[in-house]
C-alpha cells in the first residue's frame, strides 16, 4: 500500500542520521507551545507536548528550554526546526546542530510536528480560555 511504502521510504531516508529530534513551536503573549518528536534510526519513538513560560524573549526562552530539557539527555545528531529558529541567537554549544528543511522527508516530519503542535495548541488554548471565563 501507499502508506506502507511512504513509511518505509521515510525510515530509509531518516535512518541516515541515527538520532533526530523535531522541534516545532508557536507562541502567544505569555507562553510557548512546543511539540518534540523523537526519531531513532528513522523510527518515531516518542512525542512530547510542552508549554514553556515566555521569559524575557522568545529566543532566550527557547535557549533555556534546550539547555534544561537536554541537560540529562543525549543530544540527537540533528534537530529539525522551523526556519525562524535559525535566526535566533541561541548561544548554544556547537553540539546542537539545527536543520530547517524546505523539501523532502525532513520537511515531512517537520510538517507532522507542526500538525501535532496545532492540535496541542488548540486543546491547550481552549482549556486556558475556559479557565479565564
Language-model-detected regions and their locations in the chain:
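Conserved catalytic/ligand-binding micro-motifs in nucleotide and anionic cofactor chemistry
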Residues: 2-133
Amino acid at each position: 500500500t501507499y502508506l506502507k511504502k511512504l513509511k518505509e521510504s521515510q525510515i530509509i531516508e531518516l535512518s541516515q542520521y541515527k538520532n533526530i529530534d523535531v522541534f516545532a513551536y508557536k507562541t502567544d503573549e505569555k507562553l510557548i507551545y512546543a511539540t518534540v518528536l523523537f526519531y531513532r534510526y528513522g523510527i518515531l519513538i516518542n512525542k512530547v507536548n510542552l508549554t514553556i513560560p515566555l521569559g524575557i524573549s522568545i529566543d532566550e526562552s527557547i535557549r533555556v528550554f534546550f539547555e534544561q530539557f537536554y541537560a540529562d539527555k543525549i543530544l540527537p545528531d540533528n534537530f529539525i526546526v522551523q526556519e525562524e529558529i535559525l535566526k535566533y541567537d541561541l548561544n548554544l554549544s556547537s553540539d546542537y546542530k539545527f536543520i530547517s528543511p524546505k523539501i523532502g522527508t525532513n520537511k515531512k516530519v517537520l510538517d507532522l510536528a507542526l500538525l501535532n503542535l496545532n492540535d496541542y495548541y488548540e486543546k491547550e488554548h481552549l482549556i486556558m480560555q475556559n479557565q479565564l471565563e
